[in-house]
């Protein structure tokens, strides 16, 4: 088990203020959140104990609108009008991505999310299966929404037929 003690804890329960306490974790699940319990803690052979003095522990954030694999385009062609940016910069790069590229870019994004306290997202991108696999491989929670664009010749022809 893991014990995190001397922590300031925010639980998001409506009737509870931030309090000083500790958290016990076993098998990747929180077993206890509450005031420090030194007497009970002394009876346990801890795998790890973390002194969180001066730190706040709070629930993870959720990002409700992501395009995770687009991390590689961050700061690429900034300060452009949206349609120019999409049509002239983003779409040509995305058209060359393989599912394997998208998988690894999604894992990169997940690592960035986790270091920022984001523990779940809703992701919209070209190949939802790759985000699902990357999320499973990283132990990350995600909801995926398929893309509405298709850069393949078949996809373009199909869109033209529908219009």
Region roles according to the model:
Residues 62-64, 121-122, 142-146:
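Hydrophobic faces of well-ordered beta-strands that scaffold small-molecule active sites
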Residues 1-43:
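N-terminal metal-binding scaffold of metallo-dependent hydrolase/deaminase domains
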Residues 67-69, 126-127, 147-152:
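Active-site beta-loop-alpha junctions enriched in small/polar residues
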Residues 132-162:
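Metal-coordinating catalytic core of metallo-dependent amide/deamination hydrolases
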Residues 7, 23, 28, 54, ...:
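Divalent metal-coordination and catalytic microenvironments
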Residues 74-140:
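Alpha-helical scaffold segments that flank or form the walls of functional sites
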């Amino acid at each position: 088990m893991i014990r995190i003690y001397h922590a300031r804890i925010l639980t998001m329960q409506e009737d509870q203020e931030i309090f000083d306490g500790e958290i016990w974790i076993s098998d990747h699940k929180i077993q206890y959140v509450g005031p420090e319990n030194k007497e009970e803690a002394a009876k346990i052979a801890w795998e790890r104990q973390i002194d969180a003095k001066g730190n706040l522990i709070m629930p993870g954030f959720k990002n409700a609108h992501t395009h995770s694999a687009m991390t590689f385009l961050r700061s690429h062609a900034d300060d452009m009008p949206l349609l120019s940016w999409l049509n002239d910069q983003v779409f040509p790069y995305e058209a060359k991505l393989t599912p394997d590229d998208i998988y690894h870019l999604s894992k990169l994004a997940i690592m960035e999310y986790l270091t920022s306290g984001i523990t779940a997202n809703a992701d919209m991108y070209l190949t939802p299966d790759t985000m699902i696999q990357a999320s499973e491989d990283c132990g990350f929670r995600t909801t995926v929404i398929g893309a509405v664009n298709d850069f393949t010749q078949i996809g373009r022809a199909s869109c033209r037929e529908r219009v």
